[in-house]
């Protein structure tokens, strides 16, 4: 695999298993990764451009400070994936498990997350533009310091989010009536039975 500022381009990998490797600062350009397993692999500082991940598994992996541009992450398992301070631009996550993942301090633009799990994931202090969630599990998502204004969460499971004391992250978020009732308990409201 690429090690330190290496370049992997115009290729495909099927069923490859990589463990305890460092591909830091490598560039992956126009690459298909299908059914691959990564265990303890450090992709810190890597560039992923026009990369498609299909059915891949990431265990104890880090993409800290990585740049993902025009990437598709489809039907992957990546619980606990570290994307701290990553830059994501034109990225699709579909039917992917990102539970416990850390996307804190990431810069996100034109990212769609569909049918995916982000249970107890961290998205603290994220700079987000054109972020779309649909039909995803966002239970206990930590959005401390991340504004959700204009982001439609109405088709998602969005319960017990981690927020700042004044709940400012929720200002302008689009939620369903049922979600609004659930979130109102954070403010101490008690809903009367009719």
Predicted ranges, named:
Residues 1-194:
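Tandem repeat scaffolds
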């Amino acid at each position: 695999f690429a090690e330190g500022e290496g370049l992997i381009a115009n290729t495909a990998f099927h069923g490859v298993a990589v463990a305890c490797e460092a591909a830091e600062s490598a560039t992956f350009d126009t690459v298909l990764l299908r059914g691959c397993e990564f265990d303890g692999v450090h992709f810190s500082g890597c560039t992923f451009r026009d990369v498609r991940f299909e059915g891949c598994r990431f265990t104890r992996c880090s993409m800290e400070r990585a740049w993902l541009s025009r990437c598709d992450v489809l039907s992957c398992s990546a619980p606990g994936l570290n994307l701290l301070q990553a830059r994501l631009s034109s990225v699709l996550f579909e039917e992917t498990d990102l539970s416990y993942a850390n996307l804190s301090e990431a810069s996100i633009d034109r990212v769609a997350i569909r049918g995916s799990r982000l249970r107890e994931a961290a998205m603290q202090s994220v700079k987000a533009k054109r972020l779309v969630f649909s039909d995803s599990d966002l239970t206990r998502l930590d959005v401390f310091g991340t504004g959700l204004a204009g982001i439609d969460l109405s088709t998602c499971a969005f319960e017990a989010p981690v927020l700042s004391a004044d709940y400012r992250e929720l200002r302008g978020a689009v939620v369903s009536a049922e979600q609004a009732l659930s979130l109102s308990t954070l403010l101490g409201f008690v809903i009367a039975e009719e």
